[in-house]
Amino acid sequence: MTSQAVRDPFADHLITPQNSAFLLIDWQPTQISTVRSMNQDLLLRNAVSTVRTVKAYGVPVVHSTVNVASGQQQPTVPELAELVQDDDPLDRTTMNSWEDVQFVDAVRATGRRKLILCALWTEICMAFAALDALREGYEVYPVVDAIGGTSLEAHRAGLQRTVRAGAQPISWVSLAGELQRDWARLETVPALVEIVLTDRLLKESTEVEAPV
């Protein structure tokens, strides 16, 4: 079988490494420890897999924290910080990252119109940024198994609110497949297989499941 010619990666209606940016927002100890919509360990592992995936495909990352400079919050958890390798994340005081000038400038500077969103909590930091980005004409893709809320109901409400406004929810595995698209693109196959295999083995070894 012969693959079709590669579509224009900048104009493709699907997510590509060339037309997307990844927003990692508020993955800090307080936010993670107060998630109640799914198992916190599983959530963090999914976020790690998501970050590893976008880094493997060279997707630009905009990394932001809240209230670290003020001393009220701790920085991004090391499991993610060491993957992002960003020594100077954009620290805000705003709950809505889209109301922070430097954050919005950084997103615009990527030149990408498809935004992959991984933020805590779903009902606040994810939802507010998604709604504002959608209003400005961006396409927004919340990674549903790598975001979490203060309750299952809050998570669902935040996600539903953004979907009704036009957000397109994805899982981290579907994101990986969309970035890869063709097994004949051999350069990134080893990373994809390693990330997915590592994730599966970790889940099997701990047998942690999220609530339905």
Regions of interest found by a model, annotated:
Residues 92-105:
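Short phosphate-binding loop-to-helix
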Residues 144-146, 171-174:
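Short secondary-structure boundary segments
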Residues 2-93, 109, 139, 151, ...:
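Active-site acidic carboxylates
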Residues 114-166:
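A contiguous pocket-lining binding segment that forms or flanks enzyme active sites
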Residues 72-79, 103-104, 129-131:
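Distinct, well-ordered alpha-helical segments
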Residues 95-97, 109, 133:
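Long, charged low-complexity segments
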Residues 107-113:
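Glycine-rich phosphate-binding loop signature in dinucleotide/nucleotide-binding domains
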Residues 68-70, 95-98, 122-124, 147-149:
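Short, catalytically relevant binding-site loops at active-site mouths
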